[in-house]
């Protein structure tokens, strides 16, 4: 019968050498880090059923080739993040060895096995706890001392071994199933190996309020995770673009999320719109489409344009699931793991993605600038990203910049909105990606914008006016040998003094001849000098 299990054993030849050959493509796409799904030896193609934590799957390469892969990636400015699966192993593994494929004495084979204490047997050997009832994935007792030593503490632990091969961090699978004691030890040891290494958790909800198995988790308290997969923000964005939520409700949910997260975490969240665990985003966006004017495929692509503009201009680290940038479609696992369509990419989506990643890479404000909601009502959402005074949200020296991102999710109707920027914008706003387009003029910090159906625009503002200080003083009040000040040497010395004092403005009274009451405001001529 067609149980679907055969899908776990299909292999298409991808390996580390193939990824390395595509480093130039990844660089062109604007990628700075590669997050790899599990690479350790396993009998399945997804490799979440680990057989040997210390060995690269031979289908992918060797340990030596992986170390060379990391060195080459570093030379190209690419960090490597590994997927760590530590809540369960494979049944077909060195440690459990249910099928006797390994020379080791596995926990399934003998209670005398050095790995027996790692597992939770109900009735030995065939009845044991497994991940969500999948018998090929026996659960482990994560806080069992020998298991923690094996994964974390030993000099050749799984964590330390792969860090020393050159990786820059880990993404932890099903982190809510890892006990706090395990997670905190993992985090502490990771930072001992490399203080700059990153630890990312798979979290599907608000990571600041996660309750797992009755326990309030402390992911964002500084000793468990640096970041989490931002499925929560993805849900908010997709629901809005799909028309399931209107602007005000969407912004309320987003604001709630932002307020819950410390800035250090919100600006480090892994902002994804696709992953190996969910339907391909282009397939999702083709649903609930009004096909009276456009095909479902065209609507999906336009919706993706909006979502990509959002992803690449929000605080956080945008993460591209391979193939999403090329228009790959697919249903639920494993259909969402199709091969990359080399030579058959959707050039429109790929070009838009590259334009957005390039803009983000060039703009400090889009990475660590303030996030400022401007308008959220009905079908339209607009927000700003801003750095002023040469300092970003964390007080780090960055280049000033100001952007406004606006989008209309309606599939058939344009929307014209008046957006008030509360003093943020003045002068003209130009299109950040297409600067030859007609600029939009702001009046009293407000501008009017017409957005076609299913469209997004990124506007670049002039540098924010810097706050300045100065003095109000008429030249005649300056000290001078004759008693009355003038615009001679004393005035020049006064200008030097103002500069030294950090002042940048000198406002003077009119220089026209005084008339009635010795007032220069009542001069005979505005063009006469005194």
Task: Write out the residue ranges for each language-model feature.
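Carbohydrate-interacting/catalytic domains
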Residues: 1-33, 300-301, 313-320, 326-506
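Substrate-binding/active-site clefts of carbohydrate-active enzymes
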Residues: 1-32, 39-165, 186, 192, ...
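The substrate-binding groove and active-site-proximal loops of carbohydrate-active enzymes
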Residues: 2-17, 49-63, 134-150, 167-177, ...
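Aromatic-lined carbohydrate-binding/catalytic grooves of carbohydrate-active enzymes
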Residues: 4, 25-65, 186-188, 467-483, ...
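Conserved, mostly hydrophobic/aromatic
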Residues: 26, 36, 53, 73, ...
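Hydrophobic faces of well-ordered beta-strands that scaffold small-molecule active sites
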Residues: 34-36, 80-82, 170, 199-201, ...
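Short, solvent-exposed turn/loop segments enriched in Gly/Ser/Thr/Pro and often Arg
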Residues: 34-44, 84-93, 173-179, 202-207, ...
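Active-site-proximal helices and loops of the catalytic beta/alpha 8
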Residues: 70-79, 87-88, 93-104, 158, ...
């Amino acid at each position: 019968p067609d149980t679907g299990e055969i899908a776990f054993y299909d292999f298409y030849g991808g390996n580390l050498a193939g990824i390395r050959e595509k480093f130039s493509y990844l660089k062109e796409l604007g990628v700075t880090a590669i997050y790899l799904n599990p690479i350790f030896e396993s009998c399945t193609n997804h490799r979440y059923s680990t057989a040997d934590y210390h060995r690269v799957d031979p289908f992918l390469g060797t340990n030596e080739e992986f170390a060379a892969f990391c060195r080459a990636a570093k030379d190209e400015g690419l960090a490597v993040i590994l997927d760590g699966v530590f809540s369960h192993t494979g049944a077909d593994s060195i440690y459990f060895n249910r099928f006797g494929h390994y020379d080791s004495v596995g926990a399934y084979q003998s209670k005398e096995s050095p790995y027996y204490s790692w597992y939770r047997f109900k009735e030995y050997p065939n009845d044991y706890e497994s991940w969500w009832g999948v018998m090929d994935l026996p659960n482990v007792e994560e806080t069992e001392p020998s298991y923690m030593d094996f994964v974390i503490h030993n000099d050749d632990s799984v964590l330390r071994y792969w860090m020393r091969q050159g990786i820059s961090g880990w993404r932890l699978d099903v982190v809510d199933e890892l006990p706090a004691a395990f997670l905190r030890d993992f985090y502490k040891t990771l930072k001992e190996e490399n203080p700059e290494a990153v630890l990312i958790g798979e979290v599907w909800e608000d990571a600041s309020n996660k309750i797992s198995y009755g326990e309030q988790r402390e992911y964002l308290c500084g000793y468990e995770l640096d970041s989490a997969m931002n499925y929560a923000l993805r849900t908010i964005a997709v629901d809005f673009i799909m028309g399931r939520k209107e602007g005000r409700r969407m912004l309320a949910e987003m604001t709630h999320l932002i307020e819950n997260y410390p800035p250090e975490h919100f600006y480090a969240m892994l902002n994804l719109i696709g992953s190996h665990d969910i339907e391909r985003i282009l397939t999702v966006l083709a649903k609930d489409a009004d096909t009276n004017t456009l095909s479902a495929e065209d609507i999906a692509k336009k919706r993706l344009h909006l979502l990509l503009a959002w992803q690449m201009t929000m605080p956080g680290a945008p993460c591209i699931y391979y193939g999403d940038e090329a228009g790959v479609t697919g249903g639920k696992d494993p259909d969402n793991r199709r091969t990359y369509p080399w030579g058959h990419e959707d050039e429109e989506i790929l070009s838009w993605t590259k334009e957005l990643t390039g803009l983000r890479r060039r703009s400090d404000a889009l990475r660590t600038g303030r996030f400022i909601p401007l308008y959220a009502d009905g079908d339209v959402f607009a927000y700003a990203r801003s750095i002023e005074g040469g300092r970003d949200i964390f007080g780090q020296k960055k280049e000033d910049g100001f952007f406004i991102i606006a989008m209309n999710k309606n599939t058939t109707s344009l929307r014209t909105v008046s957006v008030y920027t509360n003093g943020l914008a003045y002068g003209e706003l130009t299109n950040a990606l297409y600067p030859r387009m007609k600029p939009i003029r702001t009046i009293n910090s407000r501008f009017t914008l017409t957005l076609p159906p299913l469209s997004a625009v990124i506007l670049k503002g002039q540098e924010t006016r810097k706050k300045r200080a100065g003095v109000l003083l008429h030249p005649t009040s300056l000290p001078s040998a004759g008693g009355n000040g003038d615009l001679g040497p004393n005035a020049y010395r006064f200008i030097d003094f103002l500069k030294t004092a950090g002042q940048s403005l000198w406002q003077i009274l009119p220089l026209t001849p005084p008339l009635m009451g010795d007032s220069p405001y009542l001069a005979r001529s505005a063009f006469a000098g005194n």
